């Protein structure tokens, strides 16, 4: 299977957490370049089945090269998994894997507009056919909304987020590329907040990307769908890469366990779902060896839950 240049994070740990049964039915909800799917297929028996999905056009092109009859792919957002796989009989699964966030091929391709370090269009779409780009979003967003997005999705202090938002909107008609945006953010962000080896536009780019792709809403809807599709005893494995993703996963699983939410995790309507998941500790993080090989893995966290 062609996996491109993408290095799957926590590969062995994620597949081990799924506890692959040779004749089981599994879903790789974030196919990417097929790294996790390849390992799952290697562990499945002849009658095992692997379903996979991704909304990225290039990921779909990689999936189209796979001729293994046990493999089934649909191009869609992972929140649409129930509809996509109902016709294939994938409504009762032994395990589902999510590898959240943006992939290395997406980050490294300047034409996708995710990188603050390379010249590219203000795009940031995970689905190339989605109408809304980062440039369109920035042209229409108001200052309060942009401030909230940079604060909540980027983790910037409110006063800093507001300062960055003002600067972006003041320059929005002149923003033609990722480097234009990165420059505006870098100039607006207070120098005292600069961190070694971290570009000053990192958090703002993350925030805008999350907003353009509705990533948090997608995760919430996808976790609901995944819980419905798992059979009793089925395993949910989620790899997250930043605090907001991880908090969203924790909030969902805690609501499904029926436990009180900690103060730092605000309640949402996920608390109305029946308690059907059990969290399986511990949280798994990359080894020092993996981080050395793939520095982008350093913030990854793997959480596992079992459907009761």
From Swiss-Prot:
Subcellular localization is given as: Cytoplasm
Keyword Nucleotide-binding annotated: no
Alphabetically, the GO molecular function entries are: rRNA (cytosine-N4-)-methyltransferase activity
State which Enzyme Commission number(s) the record gives: 2.1.1.199
Q: Please give the catalytic activity noted in the UniProt record.
A: cytidine(1402) in 16S rRNA + S-adenosyl-L-methionine = N(4)-methylcytidine(1402) in 16S rRNA + S-adenosyl-L-homocysteine + H(+)
Q: Which GO terms describe its cellular component?
A: cytoplasm
The record, for SUPFAM superfamilies, names: Putative methyltransferase TM0872, insert domain, S-adenosyl-L-methionine-dependent methyltransferases
One Pfam family per UniProt: Methyltransf_5
List, alphabetically, the InterPro entries matched. Answer: RsmH (IPR002903), SAM-dep_MeTrfase_MraW_recog (IPR023397), SAM-dependent_MTases_sf (IPR029063)
Annotated S-adenosyl-L-methionine binding lies at 34-36, 54, 85, 99, 106
Instruction: Write down the superkingdom of origin.
Output: Bacteria
Q: Which keywords has UniProt assigned to this entry?
A: Cytoplasm, Methyltransferase, rRNA processing, S-adenosyl-L-methionine, Transferase
Q: Does the keyword Endoplasmic reticulum belong to this entry?
A: no
**Could you state one GO biological process linked to this protein?**
rRNA base methylation
Q: Say what the protein does.
A: Specifically methylates the N4 position of cytidine in position 1402 (C1402) of 16S rRNA.
UniProt similarity note: Belongs to the methyltransferase superfamily. RsmH family.
Q: What is this protein called?
A: Ribosomal RNA small subunit methyltransferase H
Q: What is the lineage of its organism?
A: Bacteria, Pseudomonadati, Pseudomonadota, Gammaproteobacteria, Cardiobacteriales
Q: Which gene encodes it?
A: rsmH
